[in-house]
């Protein structure tokens, strides 16, 4: 019994120990798990922090367009730090360690502050005047960009009257020492002189203004300058700029303004595209200014609140800004022009503003104007202004000048300073430089060395006036256009001597190499102008020849269509009376034999161009028609006397013309109906000449200022023997085509029997006198306008043809005129029956 109790106690103790051991193990596992979790959390936190730092470091490295791994980021960071350490060591070596320089300022900052305080800028030039370096502070003082001055000659920015003096100063100071030793360069080479320098302008057409400045500096040898401190000079300086014995020597100077400027433009922009915001009332008063404004403009918000924005604008920009604000009030938003804003440091800074009007959300009334101001550089402003003025930027021109000048410098040998000084003694205006820039084309002043202030350009007093390049081109073109050049040989004969002179011209003894190169360039420009003028003259000659050829073709076409007369009539015979070919000169009058036509074609009369004032005058036309009657009675036909028509031909043509111009056309064969209009003049009296038709080379036909009548010639398929007459003579009656000739209609009446007989007898006498071979010169007074009673009689078929041939002309007259014509026609028909009876005294016996 006792043994049993002890065994049970032992078993309970063993169970208790096992449970305690298990519990201890579980507790240890929990502790390890907690430690592991905390360790993992800390490790993850460390990795995340490391990744953030690597990412931030990679964002600061250049060339981070693609994603870089950690090793690349670390490698680039190491390279950057190594280079930065080297640069820092070099800057520490050249750091100014003087008591007068604050230790908290770097060299660049101290230099900029000193230049602003002195109203000056740094300038490094070679001994021949070539500029190799200029500081950025030149923009705020002379309104030049550094790129405008670098690689240019200093003499391009100095008046011509001071060229010789400045050149002597730069050259003679070097010649004081035989050898450029380091001791001389350190001790005795300080140089000071004063002169005028050209101010820059946005618009090159503005008058040039010069600023009186003072140069203070010394000569430096580029050999003693370390390669890291060259600042790119080595690539800028060309070998042709350095004479042999003065190699790698330049004059470094501080250029100061004699008259200080109290308000200057800010020369540089630290960070481009800097901007700040502001709010303005509708009266343009400041209501709000954000935190980005004070570092830019210098004002704190409380200093500008309540003030007008116009208090800070430049006076020259107020007009343009007012227009921009008017546009804003009309459209609600917009962008301003470039304008200057006065900073707290009394400097002008260029800004451009984007603005819009905000409205109240309940009543939609305008509340205020929100503005975003952006800082712009002077280079952007000048480029934009010149684009608005359609002026090319000077940078391409400078590049072109550099390429041209480098070639000219290679061709011209550099002369020594001693020879240059000898030329100074013999020549009043020595050489300046072989370079020529666009700036020098605006400089024109007399000797201004005695004027210590700003001097505007005087364009009237100096003998040598410089003009812009486009004005020179205009003057040269006007001078060339004023000279009359009539052929191609003139232009070619002018260009060839100029070219030979430009290639073979020797250099005069008293002229420098640079002046000769300038003259050579001028002669080359003159040659180009002459060649251009020659091409223009050749084009004009070809155009005139083409016009002359077309005029000749038109004249031949007119004569081929309407001026050849065909007559095919089986029985009747037509005799054309005297045809007179007259001219303005009585010695040139030629007589033509009468033309007898029996159904033949009229031969053409050749008219030579030697008749400069020749006129073709058809003085008389006698048409006699023999009727086929059994009684063999011959009756005379009324005379159709056409008015004189004169045609003036150009004396330059050597072509020939066909038969004389007639107002009537005789058609021999059937043809398609056509209409030809020939203007004819209505003479006022018997002493006036007929209409003059002048054919000129401008393809126009001009007529005299007298009264004109358009005679319509209608050709239609008619039978042989029909005689076509002008439509102004309608069925035997004179018709006035224009109301202005109503006064002459009263004079147009039918001829009586006695007048017809007298006219017939006089015309027969003239006909017989023309046929004599030794007849003297004929003089015929101008004929009056066509006055006749009848054209044809005794032939009803012919009258029907005439009435059918002119239906258009009859329909054009008013009804009242038509009735009047019919009444007059009936009276004349009855009168003609009595007039057509043959005269017994003139009837030939059978």
UniProtKB/Swiss-Prot annotation:
Q: Name the Gene Ontology molecular function terms of this record.
A: chromatin DNA binding; DNA binding; DNA-binding transcription factor activity; DNA-binding transcription factor activity, RNA polymerase II-specific; E-box binding; histone acetyltransferase activity; protein dimerization activity; RNA polymerase II cis-regulatory region sequence-specific DNA binding
SMART domains reported for this sequence: HLH, PAC, PAS
Which residue positions does Phosphothreonine occur at? 451, 461
Q: Where is this site: Interaction with E-box DNA?
A: 39, 43, 47
Q: Where does the record place Low complexity bias?
A: 478-493, 624-637, 644-654, 811-829
Locate the region Implicated in the circadian rhythmicity: 514-564
Show the cross-link location (Glycyl lysine isopeptide (Lys-Gly) (interchain with G-Cter in SUMO1)). 67, 842
Residue ranges occupied by any PAC domain in the UniProt entry: 336-379
Q: Region Disordered: start and end of each range?
A: 420-495, 624-654, 764-783, 811-846
Q: At which residues is the cross-link Glycyl lysine isopeptide (Lys-Gly) (interchain with G-Cter in SUMO) found?
A: 67
**Where does the record place the bHLH domain?**
34-84
Q: Name one GO cellular component term.
A: CLOCK-BMAL transcription complex
Where in the cell is the protein located? Cytoplasm; Nucleus; Cytoplasm, Cytosol
Q: Where is this region: Interaction with NR3C1?
A: 371-845
* Positions of short motif Nuclear localization signal: 32-47
Indicate where this protein is primarily found.
cytoplasm
Q: What does this protein do?
A: Transcriptional activator which forms a core component of the circadian clock. The circadian clock, an internal time-keeping system, regulates various physiological processes through the generation of approximately 24 hour circadian rhythms in gene expression, which are translated into rhythms in metabolism and behavior. It is derived from the Latin roots 'circa' (about) and 'diem' (day) and acts as an important regulator of a wide array of physiological functions including metabolism, sleep, body temperature, blood pressure, endocrine, immune, cardiovascular, and renal function.
UniProt subunit comment: Component of the circadian clock oscillator which includes the CRY proteins, CLOCK or NPAS2, BMAL1 or BMAL2, CSNK1D and/or CSNK1E, TIMELESS and the PER proteins. Forms a heterodimer with BMAL1. The CLOCK-BMAL1 heterodimer is required for E-box-dependent transactivation, for CLOCK nuclear translocation and degradation, and for phosphorylation of both CLOCK and BMAL1. Interacts with NR3C1 in a ligand-dependent fashion. Interacts with ESR1 and estrogen stimulates this interaction. Interacts with the complex p35/CDK5. Interacts with RELA/p65. Interacts with KAT2B, CREBBP and EP300.
What PANTHER family does its record include? Answer: CIRCADIAN LOCOMOTER OUTPUT CYCLES PROTEIN KAPUT
Q: What name appears for this protein in its UniProt entry?
A: Circadian locomoter output cycles protein kaput
What organism does the UniProt record list as the source?
Pongo abelii
């Amino acid at each position: 019994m006792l043994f049993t109790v002890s065994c049970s106690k032992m078993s309970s103790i063993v169970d208790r120990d096992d449970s305690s051991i298990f519990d201890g193990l579980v507790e240890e596992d929990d502790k390890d798990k907690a430690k592991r979790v905390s360790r993992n959390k800390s490790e993850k936190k460390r990795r995340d922090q490391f990744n953030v730092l690597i990412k931030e470091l990679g964002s600061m490295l250049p060339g981070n367009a693609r994603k870089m791994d950690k090793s690349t980021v670390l490698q680039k960071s190491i390279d950057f730090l190594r280079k930065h350490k080297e640069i820092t060591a070099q800057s520490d070596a050249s750091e100014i360690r003087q008591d007068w320089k604050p230790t908290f300022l770097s060299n660049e900052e101290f230099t900029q502050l000193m230049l602003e305080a002195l109203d000056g800028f740094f300038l490094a030039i070679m001994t021949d005047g070539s500029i190799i370096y200029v500081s950025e502070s030149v923009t705020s003082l002379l309104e030049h960009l550094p790129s405008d001055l670098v690689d240019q000659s200093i003499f391009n920015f100095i008046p011509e009257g001071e060229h010789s003096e400045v050149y002597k100063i730069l050259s003679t100071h070097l010649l004081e020492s035989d050898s450029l030793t380091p001791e001389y360069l350190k001790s005795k080479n300080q140089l000071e002189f004063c002169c005028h320098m050209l101010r820059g302008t946005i618009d090159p057409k503005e008058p040039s203004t010069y600023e009186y400045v003072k140069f203070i500096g010394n000569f430096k040898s580029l050999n003693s300058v370390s390669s890291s401190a060259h600042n790119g000079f080595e690539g800028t300086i060309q070998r042709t700029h350095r004479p042999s014995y003065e190699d790698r020597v330049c004059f470094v100077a501080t250029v100061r303004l004699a008259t200080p400027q109290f308000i200057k433009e800010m020369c540089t922009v630290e960070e481009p595209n800097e901007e700040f915001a502001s709010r303005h009332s509708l009266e343009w008063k400041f209501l709000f200014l954000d935190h980005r404004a004070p570092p830019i403009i210098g004002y704190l918000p409380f200093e500008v609140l309540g003030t007008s924005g116009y208090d800070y604008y430049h006076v020259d920009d107020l007009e343009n800004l007012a227009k921009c604000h008017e546009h804003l009030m009309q459209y609600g938003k917009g962008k301003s022009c470039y304008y200057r804003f006065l900073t707290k440091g009394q400097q002008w800074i260029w800004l451009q503003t984007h603005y819009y009007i905000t409205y109240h959300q309940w009543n939609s009334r305008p509340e205020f104007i929100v503005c975003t101001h952006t800082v712009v550089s002077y280079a952007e402003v000048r480029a934009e202004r010149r684009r608005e003025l359609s002026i090319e930027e000077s940078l391409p021109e400078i590049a072109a000048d550099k390429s041209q000048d480098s070639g000219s410098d290679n061709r011209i040998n550099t002369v020594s300073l001693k020879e240059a000084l000898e030329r100074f003694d013999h020549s009043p205006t020595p050489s300046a430089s072989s370079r020529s820039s666009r700036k020098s084309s605006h400089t024109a002043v007399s000797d201004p060395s005695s004027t210590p202030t700003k001097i505007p350009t005087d364009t009237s007093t100096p003998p040598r006036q410089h003009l812009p390049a486009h004005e020179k081109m205009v003057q040269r073109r006007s001078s060339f256009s004023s000279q009359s050049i009539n052929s191609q040989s003139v232009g070619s004969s002018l260009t060839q001597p100029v070219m030979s002179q430009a290639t073979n011209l020797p250099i005069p003894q008293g002229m420098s190499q640079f002046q000769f190169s300038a003259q050579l360039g001028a002669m080359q420009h003159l040659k180009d102008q002459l060649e251009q003028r020659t091409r223009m003259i050749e084009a004009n000659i070809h155009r005139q020849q083409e016009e002359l050829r077309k005029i000749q073709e038109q004249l031949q076409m007119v004569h081929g269509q309407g001026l050849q007369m065909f007559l095919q009539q089986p029985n009747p015979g037509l005799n054309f009376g005297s045809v007179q070919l007259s001219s303005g000169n009585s010695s040139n009058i030629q007589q033509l034999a009468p033309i007898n036509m029996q159904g033949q074609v009229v031969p053409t009369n050749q008219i030579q161009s030697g008749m400069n004032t020749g006129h073709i005058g058809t003085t008389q036309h006698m048409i006699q028609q023999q009727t086929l009657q059994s009684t063999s009675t011959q009756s005379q036909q009324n005379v159709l006397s056409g008015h004189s028509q004169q045609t003036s031909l150009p004396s330059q043509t050597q072509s020939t013309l066909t038969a004389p111009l007639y107002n009537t056309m005789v058609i021999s064969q059937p043809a398609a109906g056509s209409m030809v209009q020939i203007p004819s003049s209505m003479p006022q009296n018997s002493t006036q000449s007929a209409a003059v038709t002048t054919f000129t080379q401008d393809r126009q036909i001009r007529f005299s200022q007298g009264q004109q009548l358009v005679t319509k010639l209608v050709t239609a398929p008619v039978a042989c023997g029909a005689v076509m007459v002008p439509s102004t003579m309608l069925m035997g009656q004179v018709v006035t085509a224009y109301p202005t000739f109503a006064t002459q209609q009263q004079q147009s009446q039918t001829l009586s029997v006695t007048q017809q007989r007298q006219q017939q007898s006089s015309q027969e006498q003239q006909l017989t006198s023309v046929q004599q071979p030794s007849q003297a010169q004929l003089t015929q007074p101008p004929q009056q306008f066509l006055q006749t009673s009848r054209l044809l009689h005794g032939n009803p078929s012919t009258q029907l043809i005439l009435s059918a041939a002119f239906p258009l002309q009859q329909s054009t007259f008013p009804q009242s005129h038509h009735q009047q014509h019919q009444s007059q026609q009936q009276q004349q028909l009855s009168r003609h029956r009595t007039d057509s009876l043959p005269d017994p005294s003139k009837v030939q016996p059978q």
